[in-house]
């Protein structure tokens, strides 16, 4: 939501919450206006005894306050004897040997039976509202929470914020700076203000600092101590903000609350971004149980619409639009979360049922009331005791109580990994290697290109096209260079820049790249047409986007060939922006096709330039070095096993990812073999990956069912698959039209003197391959215009059909 039209926040001395009383210790009371439990019927008591003249010493503070409020009946010193009334005599029942206790009253027998039964423990009582320490708290309220235990500054809560110029707090209207969040009297600003300005307002000191001028802010008078407000403590990570989910009282009388934490942008994995507001918070999925004693007072976290209208709602108002996942470190709009259907929670987490397990609040020292035994197993769970700490987030659940997660045994956590287990974890494709061998020359060229583009003031026409077969380290090399340049930037040896990474596979359509670029620069989401308009103005020298508009922008586009459209307008716009004066844009494109610029329109290929970088396939020595560098310090492979896997993959495609996958699968085979045989480290020869494990992994990877289907295809089916690989590599696209594929097949058959098939025959074979999920086909109504796509990597087709005895000429096209 655009908050640029939000009026500046006025600080008119209005408090957002009542002051806490200083006298009287904190005594929690249940709000009687919203009772959640009916008062149970008390057990019969003995006849009252005449009270003495001296007051009885109360056993608790609660009881003493109750005795002072309740008037005591005064009795006379001379007791008055009641008038005796004649009683009817009853015949005593005859004793019976079978029922010796029949003469006792029935009520006495019930009391005796109750004393003999074990007392049931009290259970926690849930409340909708709780009056605690002079404040009323309910579920759904936002509150400040102490972050440090025993901090004296947390108890300091000034009535109103002081002016940053005169350092006095009065009833005069104050205006807040949107940069430093400081309060200023209208008369103290130079020049003085007559009314609160609309829109964003920055104080003169922040404006001077933005302009690069050296300015000294006013200092408080000598001997005056500045007291920070709760808002300032929260934004400086000295307090927490939380949302109350539920309230209850434990059997020991202590009040607790389950809260959901808020965090400031600095506490996220991404840190504070330029688009974050100064008062912005993120709601998290982190839940915790805290004592009511740690809660200070209310604050108000509002939605964007509410925050826009809250121009005069005090100093404890904050803005929240997203929820932050502390596990996956991603963001989601609260509006999208609120629109989702609510799922039914576990019965143990439902609000308290007022009909069961009531704990009396007015008679804590009396005997436990009898309770009906619950029928649900969830109510029989025992609650853990809570430690008395103000700043510890104990009882974190993260919502795991809804799925009944179990605790991992300690022996599993303390298990020491073997060399084979370490090798399996290291060889994962998702594991980031410590170094990237065999690509030093290419990385130096990329680094020199980026540094030259950054040092150039105008960055005119800087485009770099990187191509190569899959699995040759193109993307990883560029990202390694950018990480190295980032360290130089942090040390102050490089000019500041912005880096944007986009993968074409993650875009729903090529036009969505405009939205991604604009959101990375501004932090706002708009449609792709508006984003294209704003980006064109930005790179043309018009209206700039973001606060870091003058910094160079390095745009990395992976899978560049997926941005091709019918008129190629997307690629034209992206490659045309760097050619404009003062655009400060550098484009690095990565694709698998070598001759992609030649296939583009002349106006696009001319803007792409002639600076290219080719990543050739790895040979077996380079693959062996890559695997050895990953396994450095882990003695889990035989040298011959690594060399055998490297030679096998280098003969096929030179894909490093395929080599790592084979070695990882071989390590799994070896680990399973060792655990099944029960060998220890004494027999070291069988505790490492040997040639047999590599052979088994290769057979599993290259002898998969779909590869067997390719090998057993008819003659024209094999020709169609090889022709698809050839066309996809030549065009650089992910799909091919049937008419182009058929023309290629007919041309090959004519050159190699094969029988020419008809279009219907080729179409039937494509349908058969589609039924086996070897290729993906569109609906058959399009006939010759339908698009075809390989469902498996082209390396599998190469491995399966490179040696076909019935079609020996097919290998020259692979």
Curated annotation (Swiss-Prot):
Please list the residues that bind Zn(2+) 1: 177, 180, 203, 206
Q: Taking every annotated instance into account, which residue ranges of this chain make up the domain BAH?
A: 218-335
Where along the chain is ATP bound?
Answer: 468-476, 559, 592, 657
Keywords (alphabetical) are: Activator, ATP-binding, DNA replication, DNA-binding, Magnesium, Metal-binding, Nucleotide-binding, Nucleus, Transcription, Transcription regulation, Zinc, Zinc-finger
Subcellular localization(s) per the UniProt record: Nucleus
Task: Mention one GO biological process in which this protein takes part, according to its record.
Answer: response to sucrose
Where along the chain is Zn(2+) 2 bound? 163, 166, 185, 188
Q: Does the keyword 4Fe-4S feature in the UniProt annotation?
A: no
Name the residue ranges with Low complexity bias.
Answer: 51-62, 69-80
Composition skew (Polar residues), residue ranges: 1-15
* Single annotated GO MF: zinc ion binding
The PHD-type zinc-finger regions cover 160-209
Residues holding Mg(2+): 558-559
Task: Give the induction annotation.
Answer: Reduced expression upon sucrose depletion-mediated cell proliferation arrest, and accumulates after sucrose treatment. Induced by gamma irradiation.
The segments labelled Histone H3 binding in the record are: 157-181, 197-201, 310-315
Which residue stretches belong to region Necessary and sufficient for ORC complex assembly? 433-804
Acidic residues compositional bias, start-end: 339-349, 360-373
Biased region (Basic residues) positions are 108-127
Functionally, this protein is described as follows: Essential protein. Component of the origin recognition complex (ORC) that binds origins of replication. It has a role in both chromosomal replication and mating type transcriptional silencing. Binds to the ARS consensus sequence (ACS) of origins of replication. H3K4me3 effector that positively regulates the transcription of a subset of genes. Required for cell proliferation.
Quaternary context? Component of the origin recognition complex (ORC) composed of at least ORC1, ORC2, ORC3, ORC4, ORC5 and ORC6. ORC is regulated in a cell-cycle and development dependent manner. It is sequentially assembled at the exit from anaphase of mitosis and disassembled as cells enter S phase. Binds unmodified and methylated histone H3.
Family statement: Belongs to the ORC1 family.
Q: What is this protein called?
A: Origin of replication complex subunit 1
């Amino acid at each position: 939501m655009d908050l640029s039209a939000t009026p500046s926040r006025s600080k008119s001395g209005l408090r957002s919450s009542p002051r806490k009383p200083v006298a009287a210790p904190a005594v929690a009371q249940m709000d009687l206006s919203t009772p959640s439990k009916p008062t149970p019927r008390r057990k019969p008591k003995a006849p009252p005894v005449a009270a003495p003249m001296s007051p009885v010493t109360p056993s608790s503070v609660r009881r003493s306050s109750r005795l002072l409020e309740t008037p005591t009946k005064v009795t006379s010193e001379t007791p008055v004897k009641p008038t005796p009334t004649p009683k009817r005599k009853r015949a005593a029942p005859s004793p019976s040997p079978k029922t010796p206790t029949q003469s006792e009253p029935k009520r006495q027998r019930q009391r005796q039976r109750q004393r003999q039964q074990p007392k049931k423990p009290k259970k926690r009582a849930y409340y909708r509202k709780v009056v605690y320490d002079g404040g009323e708290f309910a579920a759904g309220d936002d509150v400040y929470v102490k972050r440090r235990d025993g901090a004296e500054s947390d108890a300091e809560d000034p009535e109103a914020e002081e002016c940053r110029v005169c350092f006095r707090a009065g009833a005069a209207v104050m205006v807040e700076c949107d940069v430093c969040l400081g309060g200023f009297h209208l008369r103290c600003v130079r020049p003085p203000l007559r009314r609160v300005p609309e829109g964003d307002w920055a104080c003169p000191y922040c404006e001077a600092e933005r302009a690069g001028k050296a300015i000294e802010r006013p200092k408080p008078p000598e001997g005056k101590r500045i007291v920070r407000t709760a808002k300032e403590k929260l934004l400086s990570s000295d307090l927490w903000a939380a949302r109350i989910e539920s309230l209850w009282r434990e059997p020991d009388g202590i009040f607790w609350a389950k809260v959901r934490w808020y965090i400031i942008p600095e506490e996220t994995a991404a840190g504070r971004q330029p688009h974050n507001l100064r008062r912005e918070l993120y709601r998290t999925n982190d839940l915790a149980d805290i004592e009511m004693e740690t809660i200070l007072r209310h604050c108000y976290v509002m939605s964007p619409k509410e925050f826009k209208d809250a121009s005069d709602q005090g100093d404890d108002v904050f803005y929240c639009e997203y929820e932050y996942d502390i596990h996956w470190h991603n963001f989601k709009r609260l509006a999208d979360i609120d629109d989702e259907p609510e799922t039914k929670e576990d019965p143990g987490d439902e609000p308290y049922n007022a009909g069961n397990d009531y704990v009396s609040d007015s008679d804590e020292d009396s005997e436990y009331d009898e309770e009906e035994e619950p029928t649900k197993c969830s109510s029989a769970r025992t609650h853990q005791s809570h430690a008395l700490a103000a700043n510890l987030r104990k009882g974190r659940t993260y919502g795991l109580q809804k799925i009944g997660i179990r605790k991992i045994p300690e022996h599993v956590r303390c298990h020491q990994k073997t060399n084979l287990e370490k090798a399996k974890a290291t060889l994962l494709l998702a594991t980031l290697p410590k170094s990237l061998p065999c690509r030093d020359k290419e990385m130096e060229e990329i680094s020199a290109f980026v540094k030259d583009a950054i040092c150039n003031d105008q960055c005119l026409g800087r485009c770099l096209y990187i191509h190569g077969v899959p699995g040759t380290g193109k993307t990883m090399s560029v990202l390694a260079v950018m990480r190295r340049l980032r360290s130089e930037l942090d040390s102050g040896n490089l000019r500041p820049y912005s880096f944007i990474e986009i993968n074409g596979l993650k875009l729903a359509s090529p036009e969505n790249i405009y939205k991604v670029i604009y959101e990375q620069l501004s932090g706002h989401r708009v449609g792709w047409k508006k984003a294209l308009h704003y980006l064109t103005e930005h790179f043309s020298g018009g209206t700039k986007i973001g606060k870091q508009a003058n910094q160079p922008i390095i745009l990395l586009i992976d899978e560049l060939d997926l941005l091709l459209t019918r008129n190629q307008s997307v690629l034209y716009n992206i490659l045309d922006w760097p050619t404009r004066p003062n655009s400060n844009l550098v484009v690095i494109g990565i694709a698998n096709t070598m001759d992609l610029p030649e296939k583009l329109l002349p106006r696009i290929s001319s803007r792409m330039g002639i600076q290219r970088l080719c990543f050739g396939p790895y040979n077996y020595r380079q693959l062996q070095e890559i695997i050895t560098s990953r396994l450095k310090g882990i003695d889990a492979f035989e040298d011959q096993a690594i060399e055998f896997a490297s030679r096998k993959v280098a003969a096929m495609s030179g894909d490093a990812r395929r080599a790592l996958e084979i070695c990882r699968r071989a390590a799994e085979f070896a680990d399973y073999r060792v655990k099944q045989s029960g060998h220890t480290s004494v027999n070291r020869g069988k505790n490492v990956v040997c040639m047999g494990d590599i052979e088994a992994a290769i057979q599993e990877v290259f002898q998969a069912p779909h590869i067997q289907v390719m090998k057993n295809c008819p003659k024209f089916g094999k020709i169609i698959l090889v022709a698809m690989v050839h066309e996809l590599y030549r065009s650089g696209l992910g799909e091919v039209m049937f008419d182009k594929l058929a023309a290629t097949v007919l041309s090959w058959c004519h050159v190699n003197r094969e029988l020419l098939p008809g279009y219907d025959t080729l179409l039937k074979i494509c349908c058969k391959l589609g039924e086996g999920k070897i290729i993906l086909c569109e609906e058959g109504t399009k006939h010759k215009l339908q698009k075809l796509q390989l469902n498996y990597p082209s390396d599998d087709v190469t491995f399966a059909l490179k040696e076909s005895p019935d079609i020996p000429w097919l290998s020259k096209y692979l």
